[in-house]
């Protein structure tokens, strides 16, 4: 790290009024890693927001090509960090190096996908209604609409994806692609990782000739709230707990000027196993299910926390296989001490709750930082009564299996679930005739419905939705993964009877950007 | 009116536990029109929301063609109401028959435009990323996204457009097009008008075979709050005052499950007159400006309430022409007694505020229900200090003119303005080189920027934006006029590895609906 280690990133400078006293902690042994950070002052939060606003005034006028090149350059600079990035991230989060290598690829892939999106140009949503001077009873004026960035965006790093949902993660990329500047609040769980990535972004800013305050980063506790309340911040993206998300959401809505606050929060991601699939391959499904809820130590927003099927001998065998596989599951290091404590509290709460019982546990932890996998079984009454304990996300390597009497009970029970990021149906061809009503129900409940896979893989692509009805997110109309994520930070503006000289290229006659536009009700590249 | 006059419209039935005691009032003489309405009970609000929810479960699965036909049928049924509709609306609102005839055309045109939008199919935002089983290091699954309705929507009628922003107005049509059911809260200022239009919608529901609870309407005070707090309501559209809008917005955000609440509220719609335009045609601009702020008795959300130019002899002449024209302006009937009272309070507040003076008044009212037009002049200090009185919308036939020292002062002053629905630049060709920075500034402030026209004409088309930064609306990402209005009530859902048998037609291989879709990053109709 440089001599500036631990200072805020503001307007291309490193700034810190406070001494560096916040310690980066090793996730494995809870000892300091040696990296220290300064708590941002209120004045520094203000400086960061001001810098973002001043940069926005220029950055919003960059061309789509300039922004695409900038995102590509960030990807290169992140690659240039080399293995140091994964090593530091592994220290701070306890995640395995191979996972962090994959996550780095996801970050750079995501940056390049958004660059493609920018070059494609349909994110502008360009619409042109040309003048109809002869129309009766009234002539029509010339109207041209496109989408522009809402302004400076506050982004909150998630603990569980120190790269892909953090400093240069999905929300940051979506905001930068939209033409918005960013103030990023570094997560306390991986500040040194954030520092490295921020340095890469700063280099990309310099290399690309982008305004220096386009990206800013602050460290510290409570500064997130200050940031959300800052009048120059115009939107925010968050990934984290329901409690944390709603606290910030409420601040955002209760400002003198409310702002869009997209929080991705809580989901138990039900998996429904259909009878014929269980008959055909129950044991394999059980193994894959256990692998999915243990993947990344169960620290995925899309971890399948609820497994439901209809009572049958095949389902009993499936549960037996879940138990057997869970018992072989190895303990893994959790992201930090707080996360492990929350996990253990969540497990204890279920152990003490009527209708739930722990039916299998994985191997015992060998390190103080490891979590033991657990499998619970719950009565169907817990589902049918809408018991909030069932719907409370326990972040970590556990899941709950429920057998229901019949299909009607299954549908009744699922109807009681709150909004979800994902819902999964494990089905064979012969199950499909029974799956239609189930699919309709789950479509109302979730942002993504998947068949014969597990929700823990979240592809970054145009068609992905990582969102869903509350409490999965604070606004079901958004996604935080995939190119659709840009929509959260765009607003439409309409120019009426505006001279060609003054119009942006995207709306000019002759379509100089060669993008698809809706012209007089017809999608065209002309 | 039928014998059921005054009861709630719930699930295709007329229901009222309370006696009809709320009077419809004639806007001209403040006497009862004779139509009486029943205050909805809390139980009736619940019945309406339940009916909307049950209908949504079916209505959401109607095809785009079925919904398009339904909207067309509503237009026909509204036309079938004949001149009775405008006569009743004229009684209740004091608006001239010819205006209400035009507004009826706007309503039916809007319904048919949304039917076109549905048939075009791009509102689905269909995106397909096909599986890449050979991709390294990980295969890609098949992902298909489209947009679906968020659920039952609460819609609030606006006082100033008893047809176009009311029962079958922009918000209702956008929600119905999105596949959402509606509970409409009738505005107390035109309940008999609302009753007629609701009857037309009910006929269209019957004729089109649409589920009976797809549209519901309730009467009464405070029921709007009950509606927004009802757990089955999933979004809301509102047009009205800042106070009313924010009260409901706060309820919507503080529910256990917050919901999107799109409120179109407050805007002073600045008009900037450029030097060369004034030199060339100052007197004509003055006449048109006065006509615009008096149109519809100044009761448009887009009324130009602020006129700004740079000091010059031509600007002085322009102000003189504004004064002369204002003095000839005739008084018109306001929508209701409350609106007139608010207008007079707004005028009184300006008369008592330092920095403002009334420089012209129109002809004196002859009826108790008429408003007198007024023109104010304000010091530039009022603009530069961001005086909230200047930014407070005074709903009615008035405007404020300000002369500023120079272009820099103009830009500084405009920077102090809050968000606007519209901003207007009156410019000649030779003004355009100076207009670029102004345009950039106004683009940040407004949802629509227009040249050489007046904002009071709001075309209903694909490219229109009737929205803008707070407090113009509660969310700058939406529009309540034009086909873009549908976006507010749609959310994306993604199907992963889903069988062709179960996929909706919009996402099937072979594109059976022949719509434009984004397939593997390419917009195509294949």
Swiss-Prot record, chains A, B:
Statement: the UniProt record of this protein carries the keyword NADP: yes
> Which InterPro entries does this UniProt record tie to the protein?
Ald_DH/histidinol_DH, Ald_DH_C, Ald_DH_N, Aldehyde_DH_dom, Aldehyde_DH_Superfamily, ALDH_KGSADH
Species name? Acinetobacter baylyi (strain ATCC 33305 / BD413 / ADP1)
Q: What molecular functions are annotated in GO for this chain?
A: 2,5-dioxovalerate dehydrogenase (NADP+) activity
Question: Pathway, per UniProt?
Answer: Carbohydrate acid metabolism; D-glucarate degradation
Q: Which keywords accompany this UniProt record?
A: NADP, Oxidoreductase
Keyword Oxidoreductase applies: yes
**Which reactions appear under catalytic activity for this entry?**
2,5-dioxopentanoate + NADP(+) + H2O = 2-oxoglutarate + NADPH + 2 H(+)
The free-text function statement in the UniProt record for this protein reads: Catalyzes the NAD(P)(+)-dependent oxidation of alpha-ketoglutaric semialdehyde (alphaKGSA) to alpha-ketoglutarate in the D-glutarate degradation pathway.
> What protein family is recorded?
Belongs to the aldehyde dehydrogenase family.
Instruction: Please give the biological process terms from Gene Ontology that the record holds.
Output: D-glucarate catabolic process
Location of the active site: 264, 301
Q: Which residues bind NADP(+)?
A: 159-160, 185-188, 240-241, 393
Q: What protein name does the entry list?
A: Alpha-ketoglutaric semialdehyde dehydrogenase
The UniProt transmembrane annotation reads none
> E.C. number, please?
1.2.1.26
A Pfam match is: Aldedh
UniProt-listed SUPFAM superfamilies: ALDH-like (SSF53720)
**What Gene3D superfamilies does the record tag this protein with?**
Aldehyde Dehydrogenase, Chain A, domain 1, Aldehyde Dehydrogenase, Chain A, domain 2
Highest classification ranks of the organism: Bacteria, Pseudomonadati, Pseudomonadota, Gammaproteobacteria, Moraxellales
